[in-house]
Amino acid sequence: MSKTNESLMQRRVAAVPRGVGQIHPIFVDTAKNSTVIDVEGRELIDFAGGIAVLNTGHLHPKVVAAVQEQLTKVSHTCFQVLAYEPYVELCEKINKLVPGDFDKKTLLVTTGSEAVENAVKIARAATGRAGVIAFTGGYHGRTMMTLGLTGKVVPYSAGMGLMPGGIFRALFPSELHGISVDDAIASVERIFKNDAEPRDIAAIILEPVQGEGGFLPAPKELMKRLRALCDQHGILLIADEVQTGAGRTGTFFAMEQMGVAPDLTTFAKSIAGGFPLAGVCGKAEYMDAIAPGGLGGTYAGSPIACAAALAVIEVFEEEKLLDRSKAVGERLTAGLREIQKKYPIIGDVRGLGSMIAVEVFEKGTHTPNAAAVGQVVAKAREKGLILLSCGTYGNVLRILVPLTAEDALLDKGLAIIEECFAEIA
């Protein structure tokens, strides 16, 4: 009996909890570079990239070869029991790639949420404090601490009761939405006045470009002023680069463009070309604050994932993917702005590097238009293009196409997006 998307969806509904959402009713059979083929043999352009995991594309040959070679040596020992060189070599490379003119060390884990959890643990141990300031619209994961840090309730923490204490929320600036950098800094200072003294705050955490929050880049001025506040009060600045890292913004880490260095940086997603790997890199003195046994995990920094990540870094160097990231972003932005001229419901086209978004409003207003975005996503799928939405109100289209995508494929995707807006306008 041949498999269909519908038959597999029936099995999925019966076997998998409904809390595991699924944006597209499609089951993938194979994938290569920037396209996927579903179980019914239909080819689709992938502008989602596994939610920012496939910057080097599906099954990059160099990554596949590195994993195959590692599989002939060792697949697992648990680094805390028997160590292996790929873990150490990768940490050495990450220490050089993360911005900051100071000695660094790196911890490898498995998921982005796990990386953020460990960054908070490290900050607490290093400062002897417990409080953390996060931002409206921020996304940091689905574990309990990271849910508390995440600035959106539905769907992530709805119905789960109170989140962990000691988390405080500041405003994230967006000129489009009427929140200035002054407003954001004032909201941090109000926390110091109304909720917790600075001496009780271990860390301030934010994304250099908000991901789920709508692809809103943090202004450089915000980062500089947060860095100054952290230095003034002995607070650690954590940059959550889970979605922005590994070249998505045109530099290997987005903080390279912000003019300041964070104390701790989290990374995951595209770092290992589709294999589960994440980590925290930071000042050596802070990374060493936790005693032996306080960090790690059974699968953390697996040999397979480390081999994949080392190959990813080589691919970036050999194929000049940072330059390509900028070029992809410029091409997408130019095309989307041409579409914007024709369809006034498109209120903004923005991004950093190739982390590009389109915000959609009700015509002639700044009222979020999630329905239109939902229509575009559905129509694009019918036409052979996979898109994602994001934003606090679900009214933002985001593009996370592999950096290895050819220009012709980018143009085809843009043409489909324009067709979709033409049909709903």
UniProtKB/Swiss-Prot annotation:
Matching SUPFAM superfamilies: PLP-dependent transferases
PROSITE patterns: AA_TRANSFER_CLASS_3
Cofactor(s) the record lists: pyridoxal 5'-phosphate
Keywords linked to the UniProt accession: Aminotransferase, Pyridoxal phosphate, Transferase
Gene Ontology terms, MF aspect: 4-aminobutyrate:2-oxoglutarate transaminase activity; 5-aminovalerate transaminase activity; identical protein binding; pyridoxal phosphate binding
Sites where the protein binds pyridoxal 5'-phosphate: G112, S113, Y139, D240, E241, V242, Q243, T298
Catalytic activity of the protein: 5-aminopentanoate + 2-oxoglutarate = 5-oxopentanoate + L-glutamate
GO biological process, one term: gamma-aminobutyric acid metabolic process
Chain positions with N6-(pyridoxal phosphate)lysine modification: K269
Induction: Induced in response to corn root exudates, by lysine and by 5-aminovalerate.
Pfam families: Aminotran_3 (PF00202)
Similarity remark: Belongs to the class-III pyridoxal-phosphate-dependent aminotransferase family.
Described purpose of this protein according to its UniProt entry: Catalyzes the conversion of 5-aminovalerate to 5-oxopentanoate.
Protein name: 5-aminovalerate aminotransferase DavT
Gene that this polypeptide is encoded by: davT
